Amino acid sequence: MSQKRKVAIIGSGNIGTDLMIKILRNAKHLEMAAMVGIDQASDGLARAARMGVATTADGVDGLTRLPVFQDIDFVFDATSAGAHVKNDAFLRQHKASLRMIDLTPAAIGPYCVPVVNLEQHLQAINVNMVTCGGQATIPMVAAVSRVAKVHYAEIVASIASKSAGPGTRANIDEFTETTSKAIEVIGGATKGKAIIIMNPAEPPLMMRDTVYVLSETADQKQIAASIEEMAASVQAYVPGYRLKQQVQFEQVHNLTLPGQGTFTGLKTSVFLEVEGAAHYLPAYAGNLDIMTSAALATAERMAQAMGPLA
């Protein structure tokens, strides 16, 4: 008998399909059992069927009717924020113990960025993977936070237009709200702000992220070392994650922060690039790769903590 925990993915679009391929190829503690969509003609459902995975085009209702549903322990939701709230409520009526890994900005469970706070949420029945921008940048804010108090952090996530499917586009407001909040809750900033840019350039550009952190004055070498150490930790599950250039520091004086008064201290600027593993979409779609990689790392660690199947 397999000792792997069975999983289902809701959402057969870009993120769901990439995640499915990662689970099939790389998962040590998880087994891909079902792919759920609402469009019978979607490439994701067709690909899942070709790979021997049970499929349904009838949404979560169809999932509960699949014979394999009774054996499923984890459900990844790669739909949209509004849909996730309904999906979670519906599935819990059928199986209350399901572990939901939420890849939308719904955030009905605690935020989870694996390198920063996964160990605190191993027992949670619903965790939220924040956003692609959050997964890339919050570790950098947290890296500064563990050295100096962070008063303000602002991130700019630039992604290729081609990598943004309808779900991403429908959730732009939720992206900025959820990422901003998570910068504060997980990153440790007193105030967080997030901006997303969809770049229509051809050929498509790789995901780029810029992180600006205003903190109390501290040892710059210590902050740089903390950032480099954190980047290496992220690379353990997102190999294409890297610092694009050296961390930059600037002493600032009497800078006005809206709602916070004036600030004097250290400005740290971090420049990141995220290259995708190209499991389903091209390498420029690092924004999708970091989400699916973080979700997989989270569920793998949870499954490991649950111990062997009875």
Curated annotation (Swiss-Prot):
InterPro entries: Acetaldehyde_dehydrogenase, Acetylaldehyde_DH_C, NAD(P)-bd_dom_sf, Semialdehyde_DH_NAD-bd. Its EC number is 1.2.1.10. Keywords: Aromatic hydrocarbons catabolism, NAD, Oxidoreductase. One of its GO terms (biological process) is catabolic process. One of its GO terms (molecular function) is acetaldehyde dehydrogenase (acetylating) activity. NAD(+) binds at S12, G13, N14, I15, S163, A164, G165, P166, G167, T168, R169, A170, N171, N287. Pfam families: AcetDehyd-dimer, Semialdhyde_dh. It catalyses: acetaldehyde + NAD(+) + CoA = acetyl-CoA + NADH + H(+). It comes from the Bacteria. CDD domains: ALDH_C. The active site is at C132 (acyl-thioester intermediate). Signal peptide: none annotated. Belongs to the acetaldehyde dehydrogenase family. This is Acetaldehyde dehydrogenase 1. The lineage of its organism: Bacteria, Pseudomonadati, Pseudomonadota, Gammaproteobacteria, Pseudomonadales.
